[in-house]
Amino acid sequence: MGEEGTGGTVHLLCLAASSGVPLFCRSSRGGAPARQQLPFSVIGSLNGVHMFGQNLEVQLSSARTENTTVVWKSFHDSITLIVLSSEVGISELRLERLLQMVFGAMVLLVGLEELTNIRNVERLKKDLRASYCLIDSFLGDSELIGDLTQCVDCVIPPEGSLLQEALSGFAEAAGTTFVSLVVSGRVVAATEGWWRLGTPEAVLLPWLVGSLPPQTARDYPVYLPHGSPTVPHRLLTLTLLPSLELCLLCGPSPPLSQLYPQLLERWWQPLLDPLRACLPLGPRALPSGFPLHTDILGLLLLHLELKRCLFTVEPLGDKEPSPEQRRRLLRNFYTLVTSTHFPPEPGPPEKTEDEVYQAQLPRACYLVLGTEEPGTGVRLVALQLGLRRLLLLLSPQSPTHGLRSLATHTLHALTPLL
């Protein structure tokens, strides 16, 4: 695992599985969208070798060359997605989850029926353009991490109980149980109904809102890949402050005119100060003044059962490495930890006493990057205790022998928040 490069070049291909007709190709270079397209001969070869394997009942899932990693994945025997990445050391786990998110985004905005029963390829190509903005945000250098962790990116507001109370009252007045408050693609607060949304829509909906151009109000048709992949719902968004939006998931009612501006002003005008306090939480995730050790350059906290996470690289933001490098380091460390050190452990529904005891024992792993000179490089530590997993990026001044103690103390401090 390393931090080489700036993310490399990524090409994403989407093809109709039966015919091999390309539906779209999206690319990024160094974390930014790129116009570069792969030659049709290369696209045909990549799809051809995958189909050749299928005809022999061999599942081709990934391949590596000297400077490129390729991952293939088919969905419902109808759509084939292929991703190529030149990023040094990128993991297959990360690319597989990228493809899952991309297909989820396609279902979210087009619907599963259109993707599994392709009647008109040209029309489908046109319909899929609506998903480009969301898909491109997965390929870029995002400040979010839910695409990789499959957990909802969250922030902790200073006056959470006040916002939660207003959110519940507003939801009841609006006649829906699915309401959330979102800042820069991260959930600030949500109703119980919203938290019960399945994966991947729980991750995709706030990400979609964060990827769209600013707008005072929206009435957006969406499908729920897990909960309602063939029947559309309405996603209503109302901007309270710049980058802070109220999101409602509902059926034919209520009309947008019923919510804006009368109902909106009634519930949220008195809370302008608590709402303004949410604005800096986008990149920071934690309330101002939350006590973090001065060696912490970034952190990722996951609640594995609730499927929520806190992710920030804001502490000591004026020091090296840059925020982009910090995000890349934590992303790479997450894939290493998830695939190697803390893999999923499927088990029977009822656990024995010994298994419950083992689950409560903390597990940790450490990684030190940099030269042998003291005070250079960075330290990474992961600690899992029960249903929570914490990953820390630490400055080179942090002593290696104190990593576990620092991680344990930080996890205990963060536990009441998530």
Curated annotation (Swiss-Prot):
Pfam families the UniProt entry points to: Fuz_longin_1, Fuz_longin_2, Fuz_longin_3
Any one GO molecular function term: phosphatidylinositol binding
Cellular compartment(s): Cytoplasm; Cytoplasm, Cytoskeleton; Cytoplasm, Cytoskeleton, Cilium basal body
Keyword Cytoplasm set for record: yes
Keywords from the named record: Cell projection, Cilium biogenesis/degradation, Cytoplasm, Cytoskeleton, Developmental protein, Protein transport, Transport
Protein's GO biological process: cilium assembly; embryonic body morphogenesis; embryonic skeletal system morphogenesis; establishment of planar polarity; hair follicle development; intraciliary transport; negative regulation of canonical Wnt signaling pathway; negative regulation of cell migration
Keyword tRNA-binding carried by entry: no
GO cellular component labels: cilium; cytoplasm; cytoskeleton; extracellular exosome
InterPro entries: FUZ/MON1/HPS1_longin_1, FUZ/MON1/HPS1_longin_2, FUZ/MON1/HPS1_longin_3, Fuzzy
Signal peptide region: none
Function field: Probable planar cell polarity effector involved in cilium biogenesis. May regulate protein and membrane transport to the cilium. Proposed to function as core component of the CPLANE (ciliogenesis and planar polarity effectors) complex involved in the recruitment of peripheral IFT-A proteins to basal bodies. May regulate the morphogenesis of hair follicles which depends on functional primary cilia. Binds phosphatidylinositol 3-phosphate with highest affinity, followed by phosphatidylinositol 4-phosphate and phosphatidylinositol 5-phosphate.
Quaternary structure and interacting proteins, as annotated: Component of the CPLANE (ciliogenesis and planar polarity effectors) complex, composed of INTU, FUZ and WDPCP. Interacts with CPLANE2. Interacts with CPLANE1.
Family: Belongs to the fuzzy family.
Protein name: Protein fuzzy homolog
Organism field: Homo sapiens
